[in-house]
């Protein structure tokens, strides 16, 4: 097993998938069948993917309606395939043009799924309300991001990307240290801490609902490899023995302990790091995941998400995962991030050049430029 990154407590959502060709040949072990592995447990091994596009939350007007009609799915598929502006780009050479390098013309579109939302509990398909403290924390982060954007055309034109912030001169707080651990892209580029986790080649949170999942089973552990797209991904190991470590031990994707309940693999994950939050939840997050083999090509996945400091009630997601060809959809064993490895350094070089031009009177104030959205 690869060594996992440990840290001590107190230290401080449709994705494009990129494929790589590796030589992978599955060799059945003695006693293993299509449905059962050599230890007599359900065989969950393989590459699995949710092949449908499903809204994360249900539209409020649908109420408790769990499924769409064939006519609704056909209409949505038609709208996606012919959506205006899919080939739109910014002025050649502009920041908007460069940042939009992943033109939608070259991305695939999943067909619309039968469910009206991934969220199945509560019955209305909506994530429960935030606690007052979580809402306050979200507002504090939003205010900080907007503060760094206030002198840009984005806020001057009152576009949605300004998140309702006012237009005005650069804030005197723009050089301050953020009052929180940043995981999102900001309109400042002093160092890696100002960049998003994706820019820093640390994309992917647990749980993940978008990319491929490769499941590999052992006698006392189950490994799950995630491909989160564009050369990024991560590995998780759910141990079938032992207990969670002490509370002060924190892991990027938490500590996962699994057990079998008849034909279902149940994984409980705790001990998450504050540096890798899921929708604002981290150190108090608990996940209960359930993997159930439905048939040869179908795996049902359900996860219950609970953090009483963030949401007023637990909530659950359900997906139907389909087996993918091992030969046609091979994914990373060790994720790379070539764009980030080169792009992050280039971003800082460009930021320093802009600062030099401004100090010499040859260019605009960098804080008057939107280098975030």
Locate each region found by the language model:
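PEST-like low-complexity, intrinsically disordered acidic/proline/serine-rich tracts
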Residues: 2-6, 24-373
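Bacterial N-terminal signal peptides
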Residues: 13-26
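N-terminal Sec-pathway targeting helices
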Residues: 6-13
